[in-house]
Amino acid sequence: MAEGGFDPCECVCSHEHAMRRLINLLRQSQSYCTDTECLQELPGPSGDNGISVTMILVAWMVIALILFLLRPPNLRGSNLPGKPTSPHNGQDPPAPPVD
């Protein structure tokens, strides 16, 4: 506890708030559970969504692969056999003239 009897945790999660959540949970469970049976399908969104996270990740991977294959030649890193690797054809550059 902090000075003056003020508890900052009480602002975030109070006992009353926790009890309200518990009561709401019990009330919701009563809507799909009876004395004789409990339904397996809980109310809410079903698991058969149109687009899943896996499908989104696969789509991003396909887009990345396409962009990788279609990158410009100067970003590919390999030179064509007829082109020199540097302006000096692999030799050291000439020394600067001495004044």
Swiss-Prot record:
<keyword id="KW-0812">Transmembrane</keyword>
<keyword id="KW-0256">Endoplasmic reticulum</keyword>
<feature type="transmembrane region" description="Helical">
    <location>
        <begin position="50"/>
        <end position="70"/>
    </location>
</feature>
<dbReference type="Pfam" id="PF11027">
    <property type="entry name" value="DUF2615"/>
</dbReference>
<dbReference type="InterPro" id="IPR020309">
    <property type="entry name" value="Uncharacterised_CD034/YQF4"/>
</dbReference>
<feature type="region of interest" description="Disordered">
    <location>
        <begin position="77"/>
        <end position="99"/>
    </location>
</feature>
<protein>
    <recommendedName>
        <fullName>Small integral membrane protein 14</fullName>
    </recommendedName>
</protein>
<feature type="topological domain" description="Cytoplasmic">
    <location>
        <begin position="71"/>
        <end position="99"/>
    </location>
</feature>
<keyword id="KW-1133">Transmembrane helix</keyword>
<dbReference type="GO" id="GO:0005783">
    <property type="term" value="C:endoplasmic reticulum"/>
</dbReference>
<feature type="topological domain" description="Lumenal">
    <location>
        <begin position="1"/>
        <end position="49"/>
    </location>
</feature>
<dbReference type="GO" id="GO:0005789">
    <property type="term" value="C:endoplasmic reticulum membrane"/>
</dbReference>
<keyword id="KW-0472">Membrane</keyword>
